């Protein structure tokens, strides 16, 4: 069983809107996964929701804004040292608004246990790519 996951030994997934650096695959845990999200200035993932996931972000560097709800309510700025919690079922996105990359460590927690339909990080990324019309092979490079 693995207990330590070095953040300098990640697998990079470059989506058209941001990059995720996989630190700990959900397959290696009972009910969680972890990755570092990186967005360049002006980038933002699309507004999205996780029905089975609570997300916790710790901002490492850069500046962003927390947007929540289907009506895109601005919850204000986030920056280094801030901890953000996104409850299950909450629509959200975090655009990078500064002039440097926004980097934050994400811990996804699955209150009901690891999702059986997407038991690995890669299976989840394939679903995300399909839902957004992105090429999985291009994302995983």
Regions inferred by a protein language model and the residue ranges of each:
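A short, N-terminal "cap"/entry segment at the start of jelly-roll beta-barrel domains
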Residues: 1-33, 46, 119-141
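Short histidine-centered beta-strand/loop micro-motifs
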Residues: 24-26, 46-51, 68, 75-77, ...
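Histidine-centered metal-chelating micro-motifs
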Residues: 44-46, 65, 84, 88-94
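A short beta-strand-loop-beta hairpin characteristic of the jelly-roll/cupin
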Residues: 56-80, 90
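Ligand-binding loop in jelly-roll beta-barrel domains
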Residues: 79-80, 88-114
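Conserved short histidine dyad/triad with adjacent acidic residue
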Residues: 35-51
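A generic "binding-loop/recognition-motif" signal
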Residues: 19, 43, 52-53, 71, ...
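Conserved hydrophobic/aromatic beta-strand scaffold that supports enzyme active sites
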Residues: 34-38, 56, 75, 83-85, ...
């Amino acid at each position: 069983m693995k207990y330590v996951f070095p953040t300098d030994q990640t697998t990079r997934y470059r989506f058209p809107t941001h990059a995720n650096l996989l630190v700990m695959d959900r397959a290696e845990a009972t009910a969680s996964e972890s990755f570092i999200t990186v967005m360049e200035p002006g980038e933002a993932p699309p507004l999205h929701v996780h029905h089975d996931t609570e997300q916790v972000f710790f901002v490492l560097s850069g500046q962003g804004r927390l947007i929540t709800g289907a009506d895109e309510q601005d919850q204000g700025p986030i920056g280094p040292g801030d901890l953000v919690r996104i409850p299950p079922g909450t629509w959200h996105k975090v655009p990078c608004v500064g002039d440097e990359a926004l980097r934050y460590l994400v811990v996804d927690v699955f209150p009901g246990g690891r999702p059986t339909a997407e038991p690995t990080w890669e299976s989840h990324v394939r679903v995300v790519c399909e839902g957004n019309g992105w090429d999985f092979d291009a994302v995983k490079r």
